[in-house]
């Protein structure tokens, strides 16, 4: 719960205890042996300490928008760039207390295309732990636009007898 008032926490604890009365017994649901508990947190290489200035984000989005709107059939675009950095702390009653950091960089492009018969929308995105691994803005925008344009003026498929493999 995000409500950390004492009254609310007491109610939450009571509800949790009450819920356990309806839980069937499970011989495999127990605390692990102490020798199985973690003693350290390994570095999983999930954190990029790169700092992205707002000007860099704006430049990336401008390139993304330019590539996404390059075809005259594209009538609208929406692009975004987000950056997230988190800290996780793990602790137990045996004295273990350690943590790790994660980061993510995400860019997306949504495009709307129109022709004389239809209007369609599609998107593409890239989400990576490391900024350097994020897809190129131009490629991402072009991919979103191409996917959207391919959906325009769909053709009906006629009935036919075909083999189905299960």
Which residue stretches match the model-derived regions?
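Active-site bordering "gate/hinge" segments
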Residues: 1-166
């Amino acid at each position: 719960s995000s409500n950390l008032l004492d009254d609310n926490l007491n109610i939450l604890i009571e509800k949790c205890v009450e819920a356990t009365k309806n839980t069937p017994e499970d011989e495999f649901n127990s605390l692990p042996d102490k020798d199985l508990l973690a003693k350290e947190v390994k570095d999983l290489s999930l954190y990029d300490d790169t700092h992205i200035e707002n000007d860099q984000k704006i430049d990336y989005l401008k390139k993304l928008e330019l590539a996404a709107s390059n075809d005259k059939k594209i009538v609208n675009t929406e692009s975004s760039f987000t950056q997230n950095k988190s800290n996780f702390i793990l602790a137990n009653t045996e004295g273990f207390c350690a943590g790790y950091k994660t980061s993510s960089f995400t860019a997306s492009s949504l495009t709307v295309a129109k022709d004389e018969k239809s209007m369609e929308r599609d998107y593409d995105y890239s989400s990576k732990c490391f900024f350097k691994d994020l897809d190129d803005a131009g490629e991402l925008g072009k991919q979103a636009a191409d996917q959207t344009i391919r959906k325009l003026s769909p053709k009906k498929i006629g009935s036919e007898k075909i083999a189905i493999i299960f």
